[in-house]
From Swiss-Prot:
Chaperone involved in the correct folding and assembly of outer membrane proteins. Recognizes specific patterns of aromatic residues and the orientation of their side chains, which are found more frequently in integral outer membrane proteins. May act in both early periplasmic and late outer membrane-associated steps of protein maturation. It comes from Pseudomonas aeruginosa (strain ATCC 15692 / DSM 22644 / CIP 104116 / JCM 14847 / LMG 12228 / 1C / PRS 101 / PAO1). It is an enzyme of class 5 (isomerase). InterPro entries: OMP_Chaperone_SurA, PPIase_dom_sf, PPIase_PpiC, PPIase_SurA, SurA_N, Trigger_fact/SurA_dom_sf. This is Chaperone SurA. PANTHER family: CHAPERONE SURA. The PPIase activity resides only in the second parvulin domain. The N-terminal region and the C-terminal tail are necessary and sufficient for the chaperone activity of SurA. The PPIase activity is dispensable for SurA to function as a chaperone. The N-terminal region and the C-terminal tail are also required for porin recognition.
Amino acid sequence: MGAALLCSFAHAEVVPLDRVVAIVDNDVIMQSQLDQRLREVHQTLLKRGAPLPPEHVLTQQVLERLIIENIQQQIGDRSGIRISDEELNQAMGTIAQRNGMSLEQFQTALTRDGLSYADAREQVRREMVISRVRQRRVAERIQVSEQEVKNFLASDMGKIQLSEEYRLANILIPVPEAASSDVIQAAARQAQELYQQLKQGADFGQLAISRSAGDNALEGGEIGWRKAAQLPQPFDSMIGSLAVGDVTEPVRTPGGFIILKLEEKRGGSKMVRDEVHVRHILLKPSEIRSEAETEKLAQKLYERIQSGEDFGELAKSFSEDPGSALNGGDLNWIDPEALVPEFRQVMNDTPQGELSKPFRSQFGWHILQVLGRRATDSSEKFREQQAVSVLRNRKYDEELQAWLRQIRDEAYVEIKQ
């Protein structure tokens, strides 16, 4: 979203005459909206060098996308989803950073391109509303069973996707095809000389830049993250025994002699993680309780807890998190990385035994209390969490498309000719 925002509005212009092109439930889509989106799509396709479909086909596709977005926007409005100015300002700041600018520079860039910063904010606000609608209507309903996780972990696909990954760099000393034995021996001596320099502490990246014939030499030999199964023999069997920072002895390959360095590894191995025991109260804005009223209620509950009332009892009475309310808001021991950023940040900043002030996340208003912290070997748990994440993402894509078809079928849509 952020990287494309500048070009998204890049050709906005005043349309002297406007008309309704579609009625969508209680709202309408105007010709000017359709024309602007068509210009954006044209610009995107041209930048990619992609062929443009026939104009009538493209117009139909873009109008259908606008209809689906409009339906989701109306669902958000009816559900009381509101984006505060603070959240919107934070989102705009993030977009500016992704474009390598300060917020002021970003505003100037928009103005220079003839764009309205207010229009840009409104587009981002709509996208945030739609994201939260999808979170509530689709993501929160997805369930992954323990049996599904077990089946995935036992499958070949699961083993491949969750196996250990290695960040590698290499140095290649080339050997031409049909090389003589003298040439091969000279290359072997050169590779062995470099290996000895590395064992004595020479910088791998510098040697790669100056001596490697690989196409990644100027990047210090970096080849990125790889799984063992993605490596050619014999590296696939060698890599597991290396410690981070180790280099292999020169290995003869069809292209020459290769020295491999293990820069970093992740997944698969023993993993010690910090866990936090936390409980919270969640209050969600809705059609019958506005954003301001929800924030006010959160503040009142915070004051009541500070005055000595029992956190757990108030959570049972007021919290709208179905997974924890009946347990007094207790989320038990949890990996901070499994939480949304806003919740994680406040939790990390709250001392053990202390209460946070009310704060907002994408789910609503929270009050949290940190009950304990510990470090634990969570290798197996982490693999299970990874499996859940893979399965949830897979289900989400399927469920989202089904839900979009459903709301489109249920909506009243009249397209004007």
